[in-house]
Amino acid sequence: MKYLPFVCFVIFSTAGFAETGKLNRESNDYKYSSLGLHLTESGKSGFSINLSIELPGAFYATLERKADGVDFKSESYDKVVDTARLGAHMGVGDLIGSMSAGDVKLKIKNLFDVFAEVGIKTSDFDGERFNFEGNDSYASFLAGIRFGNSNTWEGKIFLDASKEAIIKDSGNPVCKALFCPPYDAELSDDMDKKFGIGVIYNINNRSALFLEASSSKVTENLFKLGY
């Protein structure tokens, strides 16, 4: 994924210019409540809406709707993906706790946040030209770390694992001649593991700019730019 090195450079070079305490909160006080609108690029341009709500304790919930284009043969279609997940986060120091080696005790600081999410994902294609084989709802998992200064620049590294809905030709010439779906939509045989990185610039306590890139073995690589 050719843009990943550039995004990595942006994350680490801009972190050096961060203003400590700009928003008057701890540098590792990462927020998990947000409402965002993102522009996406994955072969075709699209958009996504994301809502994240912090719950009691270390838990939070996320909802996302993503719509973009899919090319199949000589035609283009819209694909809508809805995702709902329950997540939990914790500082790495709190997660691992104190480590002991004989008489030597090591205290691990909360240098970054560890997070994990699990939920369901559904996919749908536009029009009546598709017949979805099987269940269009499937499990979705996401896990990663957040690091940097929550007052200014933050970075994120994550792994997103779920099956993807793909298009295939039904191969039925009679069906193609009549009013019935000539194409089938089905889930990929294996989980698609997307590795991604992101950068967030916190403008103030209510606003932030967001850039994310992730790779995929089943679909096109994905880029997100949002607010």
Label each PLM-derived region with a short phrase.
Residues 5, 11, 16-36, 97-108, ...:
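Outer-membrane beta-barrel biogenesis signature
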Residues 69-71, 217-220:
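A short local loop/turn or secondary-structure capping micro-motif enriched for an aromatic residue
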Residues 21-22, 58, 90-97, 105-217, ...:
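Outer-membrane beta-barrel transmembrane domain signature
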Residues 47-51, 221-226:
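A short acidic, amphipathic alpha-helical/loop segment
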Residues 17-73:
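Short glycine/proline- and aromatic-enriched beta-strand/turn motifs that initiate or cap beta-hairpins
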Residues 61-82, 86, 90-91:
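Surface-exposed loop and membrane-interface regions of Gram-negative outer-membrane beta-barrel proteins
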Residues 30-32, 42-46, 79-83, 134-138, ...:
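Membrane-spanning beta-strands of outer-membrane beta-barrel proteins
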